[in-house]
Amino acid sequence: MASREETRNGTAGPRSRTSAGSSRDSLAGAGWRCEEVGVSASGGRPFSWMNPVPLWQSRNQNLVRLFGDPTNEERRLWMKLQREAGWLPEDLIVRVPPRREAGRQKVSFILVGDTGEGDASQRAVVKPLLAGGRDTDFMVVCSDVIYPAGDAGDYDAKFYEPYDDYPSPIYALPGNHDWYDGLVGFMHHLCGADVSALPAAEGRPSSFKERLRRLLWRRPARRGPEDLPVRRRTEEGRRTGQRSPYFALDTGPLLVVGIDTGMGGPIDREQAGWLRGISRTDKPKVLLTGKPLYVDGEHHPYPMEDGGTVDDVVLDPNHNYVAAIGGDIHNYQRYPVPVGGRDEPLQYIVSGGGGAYMSATHRIPKVDVGGVTEDDFICYPRRGDSLSFYSKLYDRRLGLGMGWLEIAPGEAAAYMAERLGIKPARPEDHEGYIGKRARRAADWIFPLPGSGRTHYHHFFSEFFDWNDPPLFKNFLRIDASESEVRIRCFAATGCAEHEDDPPLEDEVRIPLQRK
């Protein structure tokens, strides 16, 4: 493992400081053998996708698939509103003063994705996040700040309260769920917009499909300024200066570029032009996106309204991108994609495990995409842990909790190794035995060999939220200097022994080259 990470994935980092190590090392490191449930894992308000209300509030995503995506039109209205309020184009670049250590510029930040359920699974990430990142310069929430539909009234319980102890600014990129109220809550709380002044969309519907979409579309309640919730985190030292759903953070050694991918349509012309322009600057860059460019063994380059793709911009050698990180999918994945003319691979990362229900990694087929093979690919949770986790969910929901559908972690790891022809991650799983009952359960839960994205599993994954350890949540800590970017993925298991010392699940160091 170490030699592979040192060649294709960058320089391998040290193991976690926890005595149990990480999920690569032991069942305890994965959270299967909690000494005690963490305090933060028992907090928060209940939230469940089993409730039909959140599903109905999230109906706009299905309407987009049927009738088209209005995100670009609505984003243009927001940008027009901000300009009329005195916003200037240069306000899209927020300057974050770097620290100086031994005469060199340094910056550190936390990235956490898909956070906003407000329940125990979100709160369980907070204490490990503070333990691993209280000293960082800022945080970025990457996609889906507020579930189920981005409402302005949900920010206290699902954004302000959970991260109240984080002392530095928190920036954010909207996800599809934040767009379900037309981005009203996001623009009010995170961009300081006067949302009561937003004009209605111009023109009459041009087709029957558009008329039907407008009829069924979930819209936010119209509110006057006096009816809106109070903004918080406005004091000196925690104020961001963010004014738009897309922006760049000039941190000194690194330019952090964040784009708004809306609900799934192409990037609008205005944002695409800005992205191309900001990418021409000389500094090394990391791109943050609502939706990842590589995910579940597939490449999604993401089209732009005026032609080309987001990935075209990332791959341009003159733009000096070293990584592209997206949320939306609720786990961790890393694809070190080799690029011609570069000494180091370009790191494509999924990091959406900040609180929402866990997206199954056992659904990911054996990886062979963009020059990345299974030997190069990293995911968290490991596929066997994911299958074992989901077997407990299915058993609880459909098996009456009798244990008929449960698959032990070792058996699940052996099953996935057999199915995909891969090696189990943990040493203790290498001699894994699959009993007849466990094999029958696994065959039922995972019916198609190597098929990781069936509608069957996607449907149930949204319903089977879980708030008990192991939770398999994650956050990233990114440290940049003038010579390298270091990206670490830490786990939040929900176990008390991991709260103050979160397991390190993955690490990559990227040497920086200045143009």
Show the residue positions of the predicted features.
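Catalytic Cys-His active-site segments of thiol-dependent hydrolases/isopeptidases
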Residues: E344-S359
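Short, conserved loop/helix-junction motifs that constitute active-site signature segments
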Residues: Y163-P167, L315-N318, G340-D343
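Short acidic-hydrophobic surface loop/beta-edge motif
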Residues: F247-T251, Q333-G341
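Short, flexible/disordered intra-domain loops and linkers
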Residues: V184-G192, G297-G307, R363
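Active-site neighborhood of phospho(di)ester-bond hydrolases with catalytic His/Asp-centered motifs
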Residues: L111-G113, D137-D144, P148, S168-N176, ...
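Active-site environment of divalent metal-dependent phosphoester hydrolases
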Residues: G118-A120, Y147-G150, H177-V184, G264-I267, ...
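Active-site-proximal segments of metal-dependent phosphoesterases and phosphodiesterases across multiple
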Residues: M263-G273, G277-A323, I422-A425, I434-F459
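Acidic, histidine-bearing metal-coordination/catalytic regions of metal-dependent phosphoesterases
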Residues: M1-F138, D156-L173, Y180-F247, D282, ...
